[in-house]
């Protein structure tokens, strides 16, 4: 009897990944669980997630989310000030780390420009590099933005950014990018001066999508686990025990002597 050790490569399949939170339970620590700079946030009397700090800083919250393929992300943001380079928000649709200084992800940036050109834009982050992939209409978020945002991504990497300021979504642009292939978290990020430290609100998060597709998986093969295979006794020698395939072609053949 022979015992053969081989490596089992991950076989891609799609898993539904979704969550919603309107904070109607008055809490952001359960169902779903948000974590991060929890001392800087509260759910206010109107059941809206509210930044409630008292010093100039940056604060973030995260919740688990694997949604990426065929994804849809919807949320509300209200900023009671005119955004600037020192006062703005980012919503991370996709990130593989809670260290936002060095992560791989995709985020929506609300404001953050100098002058009167603040807009809604979509960015890709790779490590410490930030690349704008959809540039929204300049000037739409110049004064006290109170908006609903929607972002979609299909199964091959086509993104679209939508903005609703008066009850109707309209497109802010499209882009193709399939370089980000993994999500572990959804998150919000606030940068603020002391006078804006309690003037950020977020609500009505709705996230849908699937975890993985074969197309994106091809970029990141990985070993899932090692399995022992015990064969039955056989009089045949030098016959293939099994094959490992890659995209339909034989990659490796294992035989028993």
Where are these regions (language model features)?
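Secretory/extracellular carbohydrate-interaction modules
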Residues: 52-120
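Residue-level detector of functionally pivotal "anchor" positions at catalytic/ligand-binding pockets or at interdomain
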Residues: 206-234
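Extracellular glycan-recognition surfaces and repeat-rich motifs
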Residues: 19, 27-57
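Flexible glycan-contacting loops in extracellular carbohydrate-active proteins
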Residues: 87, 172-201
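Short, aromatic/His-centered strand-loop micro-motif at the edge of beta-sheets
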Residues: 125-150
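Extracellular beta-strand elements of beta-rich domains used
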Residues: 23, 200-207
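C-terminal tail/sorting-segment detector
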Residues: 240-257
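Carbohydrate-binding surfaces in secreted/extracellular proteins
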Residues: 23, 75-77, 141-174
